[in-house]
Amino acid sequence: MYYENFFKKFIETHTENSQVICIDGVVGVGKSTLGELITKEFGINMFQEPVIDNPLLDKFYYDKKRYSFPLQIFFLNKRFQMMLEALELNSCLMDRSIYGDIIFSKMLCMDNEMTKEEYDVYEELLETMLKLVKKPKLMIYLKSSVSSAMAKIKERGRAYELEVPTEYWESLNRHYEAYFEAYNLSD
């Protein structure tokens, strides 16, 4: 119910069609792989998830309580910048987008890794930003079992992801399913 109410705030404000395609799903589901196939096939630009030059991501996995809020603000800001850049393009693809960011923040708040006050600041900022960008033309949700995603995470070999307990990935998967059951912004 939370996510349904969240989306209702933006349905009326986002009426223009755009050519933004977003791919979302849990960590390790294959968003980047699918994105590369789509961009190669259709010759469109792709915005990668900002994980390579992210100064907070590895720290977050070792100290979630300390780094959850600044990490979520970092991602929110980068994804907002990408959405603004996307307005200048005829079409583009996003490997994860500003729209799914709330999943992580909501989960962190529910798990007491982010304070309620931090979450409220985050949510208010997100709502302000979403009023300034167009909704995606298409949202692709890649659904996966936790065991399949974890196998891909192991194969990828990012040390900070390998340290994460299975319960975190299971919770993330449940939050994604709830989010996309309520998602109704794209055409």
Task: Give the positions of each predicted feature.
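Conserved nucleotide-binding/hydrolysis micro-motifs of P-loop NTPases
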Residues: V51-D53, I98-G100, S144-A149
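Glycine-rich phosphate-binding loop used to anchor ATP phosphates in small-molecule kinases
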Residues: Y67-K134
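P-loop (Walker A) phosphate-binding loop of NTP-binding proteins
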Residues: V26
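Extreme N-terminal, non-catalytic leader segments
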Residues: M1-Q19
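Conserved substrate/cofactor phosphate-moiety recognition/catalytic segment
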Residues: E36, K40-K78
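A glycine- and Lys/Arg-enriched "phosphate-lid" helix/loop adjacent to the NTP-binding pocket
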Residues: F104-H175
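Conserved lysine of the Walker
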Residues: K31
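Hydrophobic anchor at the beta1->P-loop junction of P-loop NTPases
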Residues: I23
